[in-house]
């Protein structure tokens, strides 16, 4: 039960998050060569996909942190019970991953609160 970092999986996760957060998409091909009243027509261009809201992204991030902590706890419990295949190094790595994920979440929360206070203290 090893949970090693797989660089290709990490890169694909990062690409998926980037694709989710892109608000504006450039059309791949513009059809309608000529100008019509000074503007090009955008025939055949796909409508942009629904972009997840900030709240949805935060909910997903907190859920992933929660899953990481649950996995770390389950691995520690398995090690304490003496389950074969669970090594102390894997337990410690999982524990550190969950700790770092939680600390990052707390820092994001602190920055959000600080930004909110800055906005609220701005003069009108």
Curated annotation (Swiss-Prot):
Localization annotation: Bacterial flagellum basal body
Keyword terms: Bacterial flagellum
InterPro entries, alphabetized: FliE
GO cellular component: bacterial-type flagellum basal body
GO biological process: bacterial-type flagellum-dependent cell motility
Residues annotated as transmembrane: none
Name of the featured protein: Flagellar hook-basal body complex protein FliE
């Amino acid at each position: 039960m090893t949970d090693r970092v797989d660089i290709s999986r990490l890169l694909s996760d990062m690409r998926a998050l980037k694709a989710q957060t892109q608000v504006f998409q450039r059309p791949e091909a513009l059809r309608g060569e000529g100008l019509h009243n000074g503007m090009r027509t955008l025939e055949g261009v796909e409508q942009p996909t629904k972009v997840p809201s900030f709240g949805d992204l935060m909910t997903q991030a907190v859920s992933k942190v929660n899953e990481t902590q649950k996995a770390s706890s389950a691995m520690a419990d398995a090690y304490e019970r003496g389950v074969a295949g669970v090594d102390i190094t894997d337990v410690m790595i999982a524990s550190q991953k969950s700790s770092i994920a939680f600390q990052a979440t707390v820092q994001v929360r602190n920055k959000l609160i600080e930004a909110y206070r800055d906005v609220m203290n701005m003069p009108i």
